[in-house]
């Protein structure tokens, strides 16, 4: 049985359930790196180049931690999931950067997910990964279908139940009990909010103080997309709705304040942050921007 390593960083928080189902249905054993700690962070910082943002450095650290634990590494290159909407260049280039900066890594499986190239290219990329494990096209088709169903179930649980990715992955289907009516929206990409080491446990700390915390994942993708379009029109950045859409949605529905967290040096986030801050000032909603790096 082939053991596949999945780094617990970046797109793990959006797609891990689907990846796990897909790989296991193909007969692979999935191993996930441990939650981020000082050792993982230091390993990633040592491998990252100067202009690499904190989340990508953390990702490299997770790959290093998995080197001796798996036969292959799963690092998709997610380029685009919608028309003329693109991912950050560093996330697009993750597989190539990982190969260059971590030469001791086992082989990297890097399907290109680029909806701009059409459905045929997407299928060819996914089936190319599947052929690494099986030559049975029916087994591969079932794995794809079950992975997609798992992804829909995962997103539905978070928005319907009002729970976080960590709760959904751990099958804790009830939101944290918090009688407080004081509500703070914590707006950030999941790989920042739910990595408790680099976020300094921001969400648990707020909940400990009796604050009701709401996040982008607790809103349906359709509502986030609609809110994004109301504020800026057609989105151009992949996952733009996690920042702009969530900010607009929660400002419209009513929160007592917003904490918006980003990685220092992130170009796309710096533009999105400015838009949300401007909108919050218009509506007189308190907003606290936090910028994170490895120092």
Task: Indicate where each model-derived feature is located.
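An N-terminal assembly and electron-transfer interface module characteristic of large anaerobic redox
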Residues: 1-295
């Amino acid at each position: 049985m082939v053991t596949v390593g999945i780094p617990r960083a970046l797109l793990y928080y959006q797609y891990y359930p689907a990846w796990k189902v897909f790989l296991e249905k193909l007969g692979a054993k999935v191993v996930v790196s441990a939650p981020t700690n000082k050792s993982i962070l230091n390993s990633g910082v040592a491998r990252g180049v100067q202009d690499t943002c904190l989340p990508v450095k953390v990702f490299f650290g997770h790959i290093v931690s998995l080197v001796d634990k798996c036969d292959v590494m799963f690092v998709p290159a997610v380029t685009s999931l919608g028309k003329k909407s693109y991912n950050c260049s560093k996330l697009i280039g993750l597989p190539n950067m990982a190969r260059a900066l971590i030469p001791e890594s086992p082989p990297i499986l890097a399907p290109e997910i680029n909806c701009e190239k059409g459905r045929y290219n997407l299928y060819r990329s996914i089936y190319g990964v599947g052929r690494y494990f099986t030559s049975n096209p029916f087994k591969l088709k079932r794995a794809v279908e079950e992975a997609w169903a798992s992804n829909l179930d995962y997103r539905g649980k978070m928005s319907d139940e009002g729970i976080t990715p960590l709760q959904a992955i751990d099958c804790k289907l009830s939101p944290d009990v918090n009688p407080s009516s004081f509500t703070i929206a914590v707006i950030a990409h999941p790989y920042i909010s739910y990595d408790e080491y680099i976020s300094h446990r921001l969400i648990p700390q707020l909940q400990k103080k009796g604050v009701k915390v709401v996040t982008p994942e607790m809103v349906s993708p359709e509502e986030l997309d609609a809110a994004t379009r109301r504020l800026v029109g057609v989105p151009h950045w992949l996952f733009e709705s996690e920042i702009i859409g969530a900010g607009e949605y929660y400002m419209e529905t009513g929160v007592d304040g917003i904490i918006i967290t980003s990685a220092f040096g992130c170009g796309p986030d710096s533009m999105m942050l400015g838009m949300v801050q401007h909108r919050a000032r218009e509506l007189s909603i308190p907003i606290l921007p936090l910028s994170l790096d490895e120092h």
